[in-house]
């Protein structure tokens, strides 16, 4: 597999074409951002950890019957993925009140929600990733009703699977955001990444009841170095994959 021209560079990843028209080459970067890029820093080792974490999570999800764009990890910071047409949506699942949700509704952070909440935002830094409802998504032609039904179904299935995965490593899955895309043959699949950059993860191991962040809130809120937290998540996930006999794509 040959890496060809760079197609895109975002806040955390670079995307390249390959000599296979159906496969893209992803390189994870060390840049950390918050507030739609208003806060930035280079953090040594972050790209490698996120590449490793998302790879093992996609493997764990596949073992639970959830397919994705992920093909395989090919180096410390790189992986191959299926080429897809992406829906310009951030798909957010919330299990516990935290962050902007808690502020928006005046709910104490850490309050358990009676049922998981599915939210959508238009993926646009220029517009500030505005919220959009189901009718708006269909009316603007972002996705058809049938596509949106499938995206929503998959988001809830991913949430159920991730809650199972993280509960087994003593981590509370507070919320997360994902993206979805459509393959050339019309399949809608989970895409982008699932890492502590895109999830809120609270440690349950010490049993103190105090919130111990294992995610990008450490950077976002100036609470400390993210690297030890990301390393801890990766180590626990690898042990789970080994215990479950999950086949690794690398």
UniProtKB/Swiss-Prot annotation:
Pathway: Purine metabolism; IMP biosynthesis via de novo pathway; 5-amino-1-(5-phospho-D-ribosyl)imidazole-4-carboxamide from 5-amino-1-(5-phospho-D-ribosyl)imidazole-4-carboxylate: step 1/2. The keyword Nucleotide-binding applies. CDD domains: SAICAR_synt_PurC. Its EC number is 6.3.2.6. It is an enzyme of class 6 (ligase). It comes from the Bacteria. Keywords: ATP-binding, Ligase, Nucleotide-binding, Purine biosynthesis. GO terms for molecular function: ATP binding; phosphoribosylaminoimidazolesuccinocarboxamide synthase activity. InterPro entries: SAICAR_synt/ADE2_N (IPR028923), SAICAR_synt_PurC (IPR033934), SAICAR_synth (IPR001636), SAICAR_synthetase (IPR050089). The keyword Membrane does not apply. Signal peptide: none annotated. Gene3D superfamilies: ATP-grasp fold, B domain, Phosphorylase Kinase, domain 1. It catalyses: 5-amino-1-(5-phospho-D-ribosyl)imidazole-4-carboxylate + L-aspartate + ATP = (2S)-2-[5-amino-1-(5-phospho-beta-D-ribosyl)imidazole-4-carboxamido]succinate + ADP + phosphate + 2 H(+). One of its GO terms (biological process) is 'de novo' IMP biosynthetic process. NCBIfam families: purC. Belongs to the SAICAR synthetase family. HAMAP family: SAICAR_synth. This is Phosphoribosylaminoimidazole-succinocarboxamide synthase. The gene is purC.
